[in-house]
Regions:
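Bacterial N-terminal signal peptides that target proteins for export
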Residues: 1-12
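Hydrophobic h-region of N-terminal signal peptides that target proteins for export
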Residues: 12-21
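Beta-sheet-dominated interaction scaffolds and their linkers
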Residues: 21-47, 151-166, 200
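Buried hydrophobic-core signal for structured, non-transmembrane domains
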Residues: 40-46, 95, 110-115, 164-171, ...
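Short acidic, flexible loop segments centered on an aromatic residue
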Residues: 48-70, 172-190, 230-232
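Intrinsically disordered, low-complexity Pro/Gly/Ser/Thr-rich segments with frequent PxxP/GP/PP motifs
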Residues: 68-100, 191-219
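Terminal connector regions
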Residues: 98-144, 149, 218-244
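A mid-sequence, solvent-exposed acidic-amphipathic segment
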Residues: 148-186
Length: 244
């Protein structure tokens, strides 16, 4: 999987001067590790016209009461930690597990953080030109699977007081679930309700989430089919909507 990253960070909204964006290509956009696969590589391509100095660091990705928290970790080895990518060139970053996770009961989650380091001449150059250099700051998820993977997503439908249909999911497995889109197909009326581009919908083991589907529709009890696009591909779940 490949995506083109056009850096337009929040600083761009706060600065009145022009913003110089940098283009990077990253592959893959998520890293999977485990007891039998304890090493991986990430390719970073500079699609811009100037060299880029990047710093790579691994951090632990945790979540408390729905709030993401990043903490230092020594569980992962990152090599090289600092590097320069010339225009049109590719840099390989290697990741490795420092500790074995064979006894882990559930998935461990980390992030590979890539930060751009300003070149020494940037400050003087941009001060003269009146431009603001927005530095790259990327976070790629790194998932370390347990020895035995158990996936168990539990879906149900409910109707809110305003008539909106809500899909509820709980992750009873021991690895994450990433949701991209939802579509609910009514087998009787052929209507389709959807929730598109669910930003940040990564459910860790033990987490639950409610997702409102649109548009509001007078759906019957069913049968309905919930089409869920996840990072493991599409899933189709047969559901009914409880009567009021």
């Amino acid at each position: 999987m490949r995506f083109m990253l056009h850096t337009a960070l929040r600083l761009a909204l706060m600065m009145p001067a022009a913003v110089i964006a940098a283009d990077l290509g990253i592959m893959p956009v998520a890293v999977q590790l485990g007891p039998q696969h304890d090493r991986a590589t990430v390719q970073i391509v500079n699609h811009g016209t100037t060299p880029m100095i990047l710093q790579a660091e691994a951090i632990a990705w945790q979540r408390h009461n729905g709030v993401d928290r990043d903490t230092p970790t020594s569980d992962l080895i990152v090599n090289p930690p600092v590097f320069t990518v010339q225009p049109g060139r590719t840099q390989i970053v290697r990741l490795g597990l420092r500790r074995a996770s064979a006894e882990a009961a559930k998935e461990s989650t980390y992030r590979l953080v890539l930060r751009e380091v300003p070149a020494p001449q940037d400050a003087e150059t941009h001060a003269v030109q009146g431009n603001v250099r927005v530095l790259v700051a990327l976070r790629l998820p790194v998932y370390v699977a347990p020895a035995v993977v158990a996936r168990d997503e539990r879906w149900q439908l409910r109707r809110q007081a305003d008539g909106a249909v809500v899909a509820e999911v709980s992750n009873a497995g021991n690895v994450h679930l990433k949701i991209a889109t939802l579509r609910l197909h009514d087998g009787v009326t052929a209507q389709t309700l959807s929730a598109e581009a669910i930003v940040g919908a990564v459910l860790f083991p033990g987490e639950a989430r409610s997702i409102q589907l649109k548009p509001n529709a007078a759906l019957g009890s069913g049968p309905h089919t919930l089409e869920v696009l996840t990072d493991r591909g599409p899933q189709y779940v047969a559901l009914s909507l409880p009567s009021d």
